[in-house]
């Protein structure tokens, strides 16, 4: 029915935005500073479940990795010996789309001298890409804001809202646009981008609050970041 179609559109919008966001990993230069302690080499993994088993990895997770040339270029942008991971996680029942929540996660790991700079410049890259290509795939609102949820140890974490136009295809009852938070953490080994979407909230035009998204990002980091 109409509800299912609208949910499909929201999922489609999230997928598009996630694809853009993942491209942001690799311009990591510019200004910024951080005083994050270095707790030794870590890598990123994509376990079958995260957040206490609440979210399960989607069937199509991890298909679209970065190309060798992207990873090679990344060394010049501040990540030494970079490797990448990405996955989509879902909770809820597919037969009841409005009960579902989705987490889009992408990251790189290697050696990062300045985590704050890396986070700032991922956001700056997304903004410059949007300025070049227009807002058809989403418009970043305001500026990235730092969050420090409980459980965030030794990392910089910032979130920024992204507005996605749903267009006429959303129908008369669906939202004309949807705002979703994009959160990025940085430490001396890993950079992670997290986009949580609650589909029931998304139908009202707001996928999640930045505070909730920051909290989820901090929890997810604990699940996907392990000693190298």
What is the meaning of each model-derived region?
Residues 13, 21, 106-107, 192, ...:
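Small-side-chain structural scaffolding
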Residues 144, 149-228:
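Extracellularly exposed regions in secreted/surface proteins, prominently low-complexity, repeat-rich
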Residues 30, 122-127, 202-203:
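Short, low-complexity, polar/charged sequence segments that are solvent-exposed and flexible
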Residues 6, 114-118, 208-209:
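Alpha-helix capping and helix-coil boundary motifs
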Residues 50-52, 56-181:
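A small/polar (G/S/T-enriched), proline-flanked helix-loop surface module common
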Residues 1-48, 52-54:
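Hydrophobic single-pass membrane-targeting/anchoring helices
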């Amino acid at each position: 029915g109409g509800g299912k179609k609208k949910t499909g559109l929201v999922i489609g919008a999230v997928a598009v935005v996630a694809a853009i966001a993942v491209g942001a990993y690799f311009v990591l230069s510019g200004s910024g500073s951080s005083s994050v302690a270095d707790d030794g080499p870590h890598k990123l993994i994509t376990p079958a479940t995260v957040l206490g088993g609440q979210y399960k990895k989607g069937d199509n997770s991890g298909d679209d990795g970065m190309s060798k040339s992207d990873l090679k270029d990344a060394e010049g942008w501040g990540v030494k010996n970079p490797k990448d991971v990405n996955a989509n996680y879902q909770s809820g029942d597919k037969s009841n789309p409005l009960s579902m929540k989705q987490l889009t996660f992408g990251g790189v790991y290697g050696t990062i001298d300045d985590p704050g700079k890396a986070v700032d410049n991922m956001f700056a890259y997304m903004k410059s890409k949007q300025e070049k290509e227009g807002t058809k795939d989403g418009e970043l609102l305001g500026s990235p804001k730092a969050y420090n949820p409980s459980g965030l140890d030794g990392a910089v974490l910032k979130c920024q809202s992204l507005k996605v136009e749903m267009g006429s295809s959303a129908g008369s009852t669906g939202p004309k646009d949807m705002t979703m938070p994009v959160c990025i953490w940085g430490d001396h080994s890993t950079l992670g981008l997290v986009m949580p979407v609650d589909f029931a909230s998304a139908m009202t035009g707001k996928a999640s609050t930045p505070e909730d998204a920051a909290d989820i990002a901090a929890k997810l980091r604990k699940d996907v970041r392990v000693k190298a």
